[in-house]
Amino acid sequence: MTDQLAELDTQTLRGMLDDFAKNWLAHDGLWFQAIEQKSGMETAIELDRQAWAKFSAIEAKRIMARHNIAQGSGLEGLRKALGFRMYALLNTQKFANVTDSSFEFYMVDCRVQKARREKGLTPFPCKSVGIIEYDVFARTIDPRITTTCICCPPDSQAGEDHWCGWRFSI
């Protein structure tokens, strides 16, 4: 850590976290658009799936280490970890129907989909990427966890009360 960071107040550090999250998402979007322009949507989505399969495990492991979430910590560990993802800084998320054996996780407000809607574009069809992203993230926390997509674009109900929904079960 640089001396500059050590001297910053909490409000400034929180603002920097917000900036870092926005920059991360902007880079992800620009990378995707560059591939899409060069090779088409199908290739861009396939490469995105490959990248998210690796990144989701890296992100989960770093969150686990930083926040003392044990490997095999079940749904409780996953709920905690989801709150520390970069997305949690950018999007409105909620948990529902929490039981000992499952819970639902919803992305109520999604920065990417909101921007597309404001530009008059159709929702980005992120379901095939999301299935890999959330499954790998959850199984990195605990391999017993199964992930089911409730809805995600291009599903027709996506964007009504939430953009995507996921059920995690043990």
What role is predicted for each listed range?
Residues 1-104, 111-113, 117-129, 139-163, ...:
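N-terminal accessory segment detector
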Residues 130-134:
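Long, well-ordered alpha-helical scaffolding segments within enzyme catalytic domains
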